[in-house]
């Protein structure tokens, strides 16, 4: 009887070990082969520019600046195209950060405002210490943390 219990315990332990290995490989696979677009985003209500004072409306983000991390000091001039951020070679801002995913986040313009959205990254994207779960408006000067890299929008 004791031999049977010992054998069942060994088999159960091996099954748990293989289940753990399978889940780790599945997570790595989804991070490596993450979709390039087509991310479902719930849109919230945005504050319209007409409600802001005139002096705040004049400040339009024109540059993306890396303030912390390996690429500190890097500046990207913003246009009308979204900025893809991640470790992929075809990203607009290619990060050499171990905590960043291949396709980590996207900064998208909507009128004169910029929104950040996480593209299903493993470690998440943070705006002012708050985790980004949907497309969120990025105020000028607010830190956006992607792994060890921090970026800001500047006028």
Curated annotation (Swiss-Prot):
It is a single-pass membrane protein. Pfam families: FHA. The modification Phosphothreonine is found at residue 36. Phosphorylated by PknB. Dephosphorylated by PstP. Keywords: Cell membrane, Membrane, Phosphoprotein, Transmembrane, Transmembrane helix. One of its GO terms (cellular component) is plasma membrane. This is FHA domain-containing protein FhaB.
